């Protein structure tokens, strides 16, 4: 559950939850329940959370906070944590850990590299500022802790313990010094990793999925941002904030819209109901992402991504196979995962039998090839936050100034640091700014990748299914603002996609085109409009005048922050 601020493009559609005043329930209900009433709600999430704040200049966290959480809420959280039974030697007192430096930040808080004094080892600690958090977010964090605590597999992130420190919730997890695979690719393999590395990573990922699915769990947000790499080459799947249970032998058991658009399966968008097959689809998209360095549709706004999912062909690596970038076996693996009909997709166990995995290597191959020459994730994070990095011309630079380095003497040195001089790295392309690639064509928008930082959906403009997104220079870092509804424009070709397999219907109309258009408009009214719709006429200030108890909000996760040691969620549920 580590946070790994990543940003290329992709955006989260995350579940709306009923607002709660206290977290004093014994068994947290799954966020998919009561979907009909949830469809009437719009989630009022704060855009970016703590991720908007620059890393502090203090050597340690503040000992006091201006606003104190109520005793009732504190006791409620303590009761929740006490119900999470762990078999762990990790201490549950803050004075037994030394925070070294931040390695990521997200909606719920910052993630620090820390040193466990009694055990003499490095860990990752997520620090959640409870006084700044809506109770729903705290509920989500505790839900994720429960899921992680139930995981017992080498390819799933390990949770150790959690406790309250003043008004902060500390979550202790594995420290994986390589950081997220998405971050590694941005720094070292921006155009994709070699097939043998991809196959090695994917095999470990499938083993983790096989375990999850055998325990009736769906991850629902599988992508390279949530794949963490250890200094020893260990590969672990993280970020269980939007995972869900499914009923065994049930074909369609979930209907919540949740995930990151570029990785979402068609059945999620069409609300037909789904099961673990959505993870297999996301796995196939991730397989493409590893070869190309980016997922299909990465440069499209969500509305166009959804259009392609509904009416376009499944993505394929045919071009890469023709060019010799990947083998026929690798392409075949992707094709099997990206069947539009969920029942035609193999399960994780069946996929592990695919011949392509015969070329998978051991973890030491990951160390010698994927991690070789890379500085540890905290160094890359610091570089991306440094003034030199932010001053480097970059189409998506939007990071605050550099924080001071958190130091402590008793630090377990990373093997990645040996004989490596930190180079002057350009800011990661995963920076979180929405930029129009072509000012003359504002409809062409480069979307950042999801990193579990929610923004208000009313700030998104959907005009005829293809309205642009924009970032206001007048707003705090990471905030989107609603731009004026543009006049209806048509490009000369009438294209609504790009050259990478997206649909581009001509301006001329036909019964088939009109049928699709009518269907999508109907679908958008009932689904997509809830995620991206603008406020009703005469209600332009609606989003700014909701009462505290107003339940109307969707949760749509966008990848605003640069995930370095991830887990935070970019997801959508409605």
From Swiss-Prot:
Q: Which EC number(s) are documented for this chain? A: 2.7.11.1
What are the disulphide bonds in this sequence?
none
PTMs? Undergoes autophosphorylation in the catalytic domain.
PTM Phosphothreonine: list the residues. Answer: 256
Q: Where is the composition biased (Basic residues)?
A: 478-491
All copies of domain Protein kinase, residue ranges? 97-357
Quote the SMART domains the UniProt record gives: S_TKc
Keywords annotated in UniProt = ATP-binding, Kinase, Manganese, Metal-binding, Nucleotide-binding, Phosphoprotein, Serine/threonine-protein kinase, Transferase
Gene Ontology molecular function, alphabetical = ATP binding; metal ion binding; protein serine kinase activity; protein serine/threonine kinase activator activity; protein serine/threonine kinase activity
Where does the chain bind ATP? Answer: 103-111, 126
Q: What is this protein called?
A: Serine/threonine-protein kinase fray1
Organism for this UniProt entry: Dictyostelium discoideum (Social amoeba)
- GN (gene name): fray1
